């Protein structure tokens, strides 16, 4: 079969992601998959910075994967489209985004560490999108690797119903291969098969026979319970066939009732091919997952369903935008239904704009295979889309649909950035625009008071990498300020009937608007932070001016009353007002709306909110006291303490403002033996003494 054919038989297609904690060996695993499926001829190692999937210079330097490139490969006449997802917590947006377009995933775990904090987080995100998974316990050759411990951590920490379908043969340096519990044979890689292309199928070693029987029984019990006929057969003492067992495991996996567990060592080239077989055997094809659901543009309540068939109208979701050195903007799309040829016109139904599809490619890391047609169930890169950004839907102009978009968190950390020269100024705005297209969690605004450009992101590493990309890809020389916390302001109590009259009389037509509002704390169910309601009756304010009051109020919310941070979580109710036949205008009511909101907010017990991070520190027992003391001194609240593979884990909620430079402090307190991870948890009110400092700093007193 030619490499560049796209399979139209969707039962043979798998769209999968490989998800894991930073160092569980995700990129290495992906590399091996590409090697054994015959695309990459030289195995790339992350250690040497030569991995095929890590295509930005920085990824190769830091040895972590930032952009999820989509890669296509073939295995035994099946086509696998892999989306590489980053494991670092600052890149959760990339992970969420890739999960949205996957049908299944391989969760890679470190055989020594088992489930780590980050793996927990990625696992929960996959739960959110209901992604079926198989688990691969990697690094079985590492000293201290323990398959059974890893499986236990999956049950305890993830609460997952896992079914081992393989057991390791040997461990650490003597790791040779796996026992296949479905076929009841051992698969071993001999020492002379350097790159592990060949493995031998042999009888199960005698010392493992008992363990294999025990786990085989567990597997069969789980399998038998999926189906009445199998249960009868099993209870009647008959052997279940290999096909019956595989079919049942597939059923359990696709419904996310259970997660098969395999093991191996990608770095030592052992266990990768059986894992590929498991991807085909157990993970869903585009036909096994629910059809895509969306709504008619502009009508949220009119639901539309698109099945993964080429006979349906075309629909696709853009899940990533990347900048390519030659082609400019590359948009990665998952086609959910229908088919479309390159050069066709489609509509971006999210934004209501027409787009023309230039060239279509299926990607291999950063090499491209051009294709003529994009069809349902596959992932493509497209050139030539102008207005499409992450999360937008493309559809057939005559049958429009908006697929559910993705939700992105607000930035929690900001830095001011100043170009060094006039020419850098232009490059800076171009680079910011490009990066914002690629990454929706990267936000930019102009600080009105200082005139500086401020960029915001999900963490220090996230901003470091963005600034670094500006330097490398766009050659921007800029001075970067110290990271600042993204504070917000809100109100604590209801204030009724605040009025404001805006009038100006300077010859000619004046300006006049009078408004009366009440203001109260508010949190929407869908996470909305603002609501406007008009209770004006009897035309006291003409209908066309009411949106202006709303717009004015929202303008005023950009700069809070205490320290100029954005105001959130409030509801404005417009009660009454007055207008003047000649002097009233939209502008007058906008100004009135803006001023009355400031006046009301100042009276509604305003407070400052700060981002609180969920911090998890893993430390040897000896340093436990120091770590806890240090977290307490950072205004941390200890949530839980537990033991994890001989180390202690402290979970705490700590304000982000207290976490700057924590890496260094933790190293020196624990002689480099502890590590930590942190992820945004929520916004909470700042204590009064800290609030005073923040206000004093902001108002320059």
Curated annotation (Swiss-Prot):
Molecular-function GO term, any one: GTP binding
Positions contributing to GTP binding: 20-27, 84-88, 138-141
CC annotations in GO: cytoplasm
Alphabetized UniProt keyword annotations: Cytoplasm, Elongation factor, GTP-binding, Nucleotide-binding, Protein biosynthesis
Disulfides per UniProt: none
A matching Pfam family: EFG_III
Domain tr-type G: 11-287
GO biological process, one term: ribosome disassembly
Stated role: Catalyzes the GTP-dependent ribosomal translocation step during translation elongation. During this step, the ribosome changes from the pre-translocational (PRE) to the post-translocational (POST) state as the newly formed A-site-bound peptidyl-tRNA and P-site-bound deacylated tRNA move to the P and E sites, respectively. Catalyzes the coordinated movement of the two tRNA molecules, the mRNA and conformational changes in the ribosome.
PANTHER family per record: RIBOSOME-RELEASING FACTOR 2, MITOCHONDRIAL (PTHR43261:SF1), TRANSLATION ELONGATION FACTOR G-RELATED (PTHR43261)
Family label: Belongs to the TRAFAC class translation factor GTPase superfamily. Classic translation factor GTPase family. EF-G/EF-2 subfamily.
Protein name from the UniProt record: Elongation factor G
